[in-house]
Amino acid sequence: MGLSLLWALLQDMALAAVPALGFAMVFNVPLKVLPYCALLGGVGHGVRFLAMHFGMNIEWASFLAAILIGIIGIRWSRWLLAHPKVFTVAAVIPMFPGISAYTAMISVVEISHLGYSEALMSVMITNFLKASFIVGALSIGLSLPGIWLYRKRPGV
């Protein structure tokens, strides 16, 4: 079991690094930091994969992975003299909930075309809320490390 989990984790990380690298190239990230964007995308997706494997739901796993991406991105930005968003935005994009959002929109189109049905409405609401919570978890998780690490005075 351990070896198959490790293989699945490495596969997940490698496949997540590809879109992170692609979006970093679309965002015109400097060439010297492209490997770090891919690595951070793979690490973040790998953390989410492990958290989900050990029983955490996808919303909380995405939140945890986004926090880790934010922390590593801030540390690397000081080391490589680049803005943290250079690393973090491209790294978090592979975790966006494309399937849930697509299923919700298809359900909306089917409701519009076929008429109301309780099953379609349930699918639409479930997938819309799931996608919304994942996007919210990613955005809040990505912003929290900056608030924690850059704050100079106490919050109270």
From Swiss-Prot:
* A Pfam family reported for this protein in Swiss-Prot or TrEMBL: ThrE_2
Under the heading InterPro entries, the entry gives: ThrE_2, ThrE_Dicarb/AminoAcid_Exp, YjjB
Chief place where the protein resides:
membrane
Among the entry's GO cellular component annotations, what is one? Answer: plasma membrane
Q: Signal sequence: where?
A: none
Q: State the membrane topology.
A: Multi-pass membrane protein
S-S pairs: none
TM region positions: 7-27, 54-74, 86-106, 128-148
Tell me where in or outside the cell this protein is found. Answer: Cell inner membrane
A GO term (biological process) for this protein?
succinate transport
Q: Which UniProt keywords apply?
A: Cell inner membrane, Cell membrane, Membrane, Transmembrane, Transmembrane helix, Transport
Q: What task does this protein carry out?
A: Involved in succinate export with YjjP. Both proteins are required for export.
| Sequence similarity | Belongs to the ThrE exporter (TC 2.A.79) family.
Quaternary structure and partners: The transporter is composed of YjjB and YjjP.
Q: What is this protein called?
A: Probable succinate transporter subunit YjjB
